[in-house]
């Protein structure tokens, strides 16, 4: 991706400039500046470079996913765990880059405004020129997000991890507010930046406490210090707690999620989808590294287990209740994303319970990672459908989905598939990932109940409270059906305001249909088995560090 970043800066600036050697008449071509070449001066060039960069990086990461671990510079480790998440991030960024072809379109030979033009024509021409001008800026930021996320997955040092997270986060703050001509975009970006900056500051302060306590920020050293600790050191406890606040913001866990709905609804839909999938997965990688590697004691309950379990239930319930009353589809999907964070936090809480064996922990973490992987398909796919509506200036109200089944049955069918998968309806990939998480929680906790199965009340009183986390996931998934099915209802049973078909947008449609097909294939069959095997191998690699 570093090559792609250099290419996207240099190629659009290639021209016929020459440098004259002093005291001679010899002119040497320098290729940068002067009159730009027609081919490289095309405003669509940055998008093409971005698409190629992410495609090559994604395929390379996929091919290398099973390679042996390799240490880089003493603070980075390329292993199965880092590669599976890098592949996930690059896949999401590739979809976003392809979708943005039509969300921020570039037009060749765009006309300039003239005195005889009407105000509407002038505004339209200026909008086209602005979109052309900011192509390079947008895709540079997108590649910077990819660089930060990919390096973050390999970090074995807490300082390196925070630096990489901030590299990705600062770029996403700008991307949220990228449409500065939109009042909602600027407001969303400001809120997201302020809350994110405060969360980052708290996390960095927590990191400094951990350094004060242990004298090192290497994850292995921190783990050894934690295991050797007698009792609970205040510096260590407060340090981990502050890190949890920072990462809680990244995964949109309540009550640190308050800026997320505004950011998702104000940003362009492809960026909202990126925040709901890749950015969330980045937060969970950090949680895995800090909670599981450093703080899970052998055969004992982790310090954070009860708090994380409570946060999980509050997060999933808050997200689903808020989504029920949302009229903005992007805001609804944002609260849905909060609920999904709660489901995954519940599973992570079980790993720190002290009653989970290594094998059961592998099953649970595999389920969470698999859910993060398939979330890229159906959550980002749903945002891409909203992107299609945004190309018409719509998508910010659920009324804009009315009659979509009549206007474009294929797009409406894909959207319905995505929301069913978000709800966890079989045989889709969202059902399989939720089933694996619930199965992991139940298999760990159910055996702690009374052996007298004839008395359900006695068993319910004696079973470990972790069991009720699985029950909370089931109940909240049932609750979520109300707002997910509402989307299907308005698409197929309401009359559209216009019967005009959606714009062609071929690359955007291709991305939507790819997500829909993979949502089906990853739910059952050989593709889901292949993906589960990859994820399981990655988690095995991760658990060897514990």
Question: What are these model-predicted stretches?
Answer:
Residues 1-546:
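Alpha-helical transmembrane segments of multi-pass membrane proteins predominantly involved
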